[in-house]
Amino acid sequence: MSKKGLLIVISGPSGAGKGTICKALMKEQQFWLSVSATTREPREKEVEGKSYYFLTVDEFKSKISEDGFLEYAEVYGNYYGTPKKSVCEKIDNGENVILEIDIQGALKVKENYPEGVFIFILPPSMEELKKRIIGRGSETEKSLMTRFKSAYKEINYVSKYNYAIINDTVENAVTKINSIIVAEKCRVDRIKDNIIDSKEGKIHEQFYD
């Protein structure tokens, strides 16, 4: 199996259950959850390096010029981004990194880190998606319609991903994602260097020791 960790990028429409699945994965296995950087002010109880990396606008722009983000965007006047260095260090150390991110951000990450594992979370049906969003109790009728329209559009991006998981139950979704991770770590293009180095080492021992 591959000695390097994996970058597991999880996204999907609002209400598909991405956050719940990521929390369940974090409980089951040793994952490192990617922490975003932002230029917005810290909110109460937010912790530097755990909630976000809080940067000034100048610091953020400096990192952009240094190609320091896997992706970044400006939202309502504040910058948000996924720091490249911290993610790559964890992966090189053999840790699996989970990145829960919106679809546009995921596609940017794919451009910069195509060897990542990109998983799209789908609801069992659009009717179920509607129930989940309504069940939150935090949406107006107008915002509900906006979310539904957005979800229909976002589902069209599923073909850009490596895998699609239907979130009928969290347990089933987590089991499937864990299976994907095991399979990805056994892919020849991820482990061929380890195999070749191991073979050459054994041949060298047989002939020269």
From Swiss-Prot:
Keywords: ATP-binding, Cytoplasm, Kinase, Nucleotide-binding, Transferase. The keyword Kinase applies. The keyword Transferase applies. PROSITE patterns: GUANYLATE_KINASE_1, GUANYLATE_KINASE_2. GO terms for cellular component: cytosol. InterPro entries: GK/Ca_channel_bsu, Guanylate_kin-like_dom, Guanylate_kinase, Guanylate_kinase_CS, P-loop_NTPase. Its main location: cytoplasm. GO terms for molecular function: ATP binding; guanylate kinase activity. Pfam families: Guanylate_kin (PF00625). It is found in: Cytoplasm. Its EC number is 2.7.4.8. It catalyses: GMP + ATP = GDP + ADP. Gene3D superfamilies: Guanylate Kinase phosphate binding domain (3.30.63.10), P-loop containing nucleotide triphosphate hydrolases (3.40.50.300). ATP binds at residues 12-19. Residues 5-182 form the Guanylate kinase-like domain. Belongs to the guanylate kinase family. Essential for recycling GMP and indirectly, cGMP. This is Guanylate kinase. It comes from Clostridium acetobutylicum (strain ATCC 824 / DSM 792 / JCM 1419 / IAM 19013 / LMG 5710 / NBRC 13948 / NRRL B-527 / VKM B-1787 / 2291 / W). The gene is gmk.
